[in-house]
A protein has these predicted regions:
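PRPP-associated nucleotide enzymes
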Residues: 1-169
Length: 169
């Protein structure tokens, strides 16, 4: 069992189906057994699954996360066009949306930020001070790429705005 099909496929398994709302699946020595805990359960979605949490190669409810993110970038351009020189993704999860934005707008995509791969998620730090420090340690601009350029920064989401505020300074 896995929350994303990609985890199963990486291990050479085959995705069979999703567990239904209110369903309990038990696998034991006698096989797989499915029980409905509640028959009136309604499926609920967390939008952050497609926007942020899921891997790009994951498919959730028949929607590929990469394609969802890329399409959101195209929609961003249509809804909020701007006159800039470069589209710069916030690594790593901002890339698919930035690609879509660049494709739809015709504005070149450029890697303008380098991510420190050893820094974890910044929005879950307990204090604002810790979040600010973590963002400064996590992302560094490529000055020779962004200097004197008008850029649009594309990130996957804004939870507290800490990353955005620090990057635009």
């Amino acid at each position: 069992f896995a929350s994303e099909n990609a985890a199963i496929e990486i291990l050479g398994g085959t995705f069979t189906r999703d567990v239904a709302p209110g369903e309990i699946v038990v696998v034991d020595s006698e096989g797989e057994h499915s029980y409905m805990f509640e028959h009136q359960s309604k499926k609920s979605h967390c939008i952050f699954e497609h926007i942020y949490f899921a891997r790009n190669d994951a498919t959730l409810d028949d929607i590929n996360s990469y394609m969802f993110r890329r399409r959101s970038g195209k929609i961003m351009w249509r809804e909020s066009p701007c006159d800039v020189d470069l589209v710069v993704p916030v690594p790593d999860s901002g890339y698919p949306s930035a690609i879509g934005y660049s494709q739809e707008s015709g504005i070149p995509l450029a890697e303008g930020l380098v991510k420190n791969r050893y820094m974890g998620r910044t929005f879950i730090k307990p204090t604002q001070e810790e979040r600010e420090i973590a963002v400064k340690l996590k992302l560094n601009p490529l000055s020779h790429v962004v200097k004197d350029k008008r850029i649009v920064l594309i990130d996957d989401s804004i939870v507290r705005g800490t990353t955005s505020r620090n990057l635009i300074q």
